[in-house]
Amino acid sequence: MRKKSVSRICLSLLMGASICMSSVSVVFAAEETENAPEAEVSAETEASESTEGERLVDLDLTAFCTDGEYRYKGIPWLASLEEAEETLGVSLEPMMEGMNTQMGSFVAPTEFRGESGYIGLGLLNDGVTDISFWFGTDSNNKDKYDGDLTELSDYVLEQFTELYGEPDEVTDKEQEYGDAFKGYQWQEIKDGDVKTALSIQCMYEPSGGRMYSLAVGADSREAMIQVKKEIGEIPEDFEAETTETPEETEVSEEGTE
């Protein structure tokens, strides 16, 4: 895929709707149907070549947890772009012209169960802080996208539940412009703080309509806070809000009775 093509598509989508992957803002970036890769690629294989010579990153649902942390294929949080590319087996390019590893997103095409999309890595201060896979389109371009990602989302949710248990958090709400958002999140919690998270995030047309956007990925809140402290964006003594476990919440409620 030519860099100009990717940058044009992603720039267009940046002007549309965006969602948050945990505390990190993640922008949906997916190409319109007519621009999707033509090659039929198995999602169960490693990164493979399309008929146009592109390298497609595989989405391996079993590879989102390593040593108790939510991260993709063991890529350490705050790894360099080069380290991530070596593990993924592809070269990623800036989502927009002018983006760099100090603060930016880097993308490459992917395909999963017949749906074309992108993998995106968010970097801050030269380190990876989130990795996600995006399918479909944004709210501004949904009329040009005739797909429905409901079946794919259901499959991912089923697989994640089998692999990682029931989600720790489920969000279901209507957006101001009428479309519906639904999200699922699995959390790694240490000392009451969310360290890393795995998420599924979906956007639907109003009144239970078709799903036109799907994001699947992991992020590190701990890494993000660490970097922001290093660059002086937040104070050194900053502490994230403590997340209570269900047992702690129950004890707290009993104590107030």
Where are these regions (language model features)?
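Mid-chain, structured segments of secreted extracytoplasmic proteins
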Residues: 108-138
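Sec-dependent signal peptide cleavage junction
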Residues: 20-36
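Bacterial N-terminal signal peptides that target proteins for export
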Residues: 2-13
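Extracellular mucin-like PTS domains
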Residues: 41-45
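Intrinsically disordered, low-complexity repeat segments enriched in small/polar residues
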Residues: 6-7, 22, 36-38, 48, ...
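Bacterial N-terminal signal peptides
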Residues: 12-22
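Non-cytosolic coordination micro-motifs
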Residues: 46-105, 130, 135-257
